[in-house]
């Protein structure tokens, strides 16, 4: 009776602790009494799990990594680093390395000799232990770092999702020659030194009014590279007038916009076009409307038509005239060279006036 109550009490205590049924002591095998029994020798060893000193990229057991033999500085710094770290526990490892390098440079050859001999002994021993050793540096992390620092790598990773390939920027650095083949042949380089005439068609003149473009022979016009600076009153007194003295022709001539960046030169009736040079910026439109109220008699009073015809005949007998700016016609007529220049300029202006009725009419 007493024994059965003791067994019932022991069973209840065991159930309260482990909540599992415990068999009687005489039926439990002897091996199960030990709390931590070692595994049987037949069972395989448990495989190491990642995160406990092992990784998936661990080197193969048959090919362990062999460390390089230490040189003289490493042999000396092995103990010296420990001593400096104990003396300066707050210093960073990089600062310690700088201090060690400076201290090693300050050593004499006699002080370095024992460490050099020890490094040579370690090298010979390493060569005997690993005759097939080959140094293979680990540069994968450095290569990734350089790749991250590459600006083209950032451009590719900017999240460009437009569906179109990115434009190659290398062709903007290449300078194509003007005379070569390609799209830049007819347009020229996009530089400030480019002339405005480079982007025009060969058949279309530059800065000509619409009525001048209808002229059957635009080769009579030639560019003048310097803008002529003279007043409007002086222009009216120096430019020769057409032979027709009717006021209607005079008014139409005044209203015709004459660009000051051009002067006229005949080419003997040939239809060949003169190549256009570099063009100056177009001048401001002259205020010709302010002269409509002037009397036509005052405008015609300073011109002698007979003298003008005499100069015209002389210029035709002497040959083709030289082009001369109109702003230089105000000098004295006593010098022969200036008189010849004046005759040539008047001849050019009269030839231009022959085409005035066709242009304005």
From Swiss-Prot:
The biased composition feature labelled Pro residues covers 36-49
- Report the principal subcellular site: nucleus
The Gene Ontology biological process annotation of the record reads:
angiogenesis; heart development; lymphangiogenesis; negative regulation of Wnt signaling pathway; positive regulation of transcription by RNA polymerase II; vasculogenesis
List keywords of the entry alphabetically: Developmental protein, DNA-binding, Nucleus, Transcription, Transcription regulation
Basic and acidic residues biased stretches: 148-157
Residues annotated as DNA-binding region? 66-134
Which stretches of sequence are listed as region Disordered? 17-65, 127-163
Entry's PROSITE patterns? Answer: HMG_BOX_2 (PS50118), SOX_C (PS51516)
UniProt region (Important for transcriptional activation), positions on chain: 147-208
Q: Name one GO cellular component term.
A: nucleus
Question: Which GO MF terms are attached to this record?
Answer: DNA-binding transcription activator activity, RNA polymerase II-specific; RNA polymerase II cis-regulatory region sequence-specific DNA binding; sequence-specific DNA binding
According to the UniProt entry, where does the motif 9aaTAD sit in this chain? 306-314
Where does the record say this protein resides?
Nucleus
Q: In which tissues is it expressed?
A: Expressed in the adult spleen, lung, heart and kidney, and at a lower level in the adult testis, liver and brain.
Which region ranges are annotated with the description Interaction with DNA? 68-81, 92-104
Question: Boundaries of each Sox C-terminal domain copy?
Answer: 234-360
Q: What role does this protein play? A: Transcription factor. Binds to the consensus DNA sequence 5'-AACAAT-3'. Also binds 5'-CACAAT-3' and 5'-AATAAT-3' but with a lower affinity. Acts partially redundantly with sox7 during cardiogenesis, acting indirectly through nodal-signaling to induce mesodermal, organizer and endodermal tissues, which then interact to initiate cardiogenesis. Also acts as an antagonist of beta-catenin signaling.
Q: Which PANTHER family match?
A: SOX TRANSCRIPTION FACTOR, TRANSCRIPTION FACTOR SOX-18
Query: Domain comment?
Result: Binds target DNA via the HMG box domain.
What is the name of the protein in this document?
Transcription factor Sox-18B
Supply the source organism for this entry: Xenopus laevis (African clawed frog)
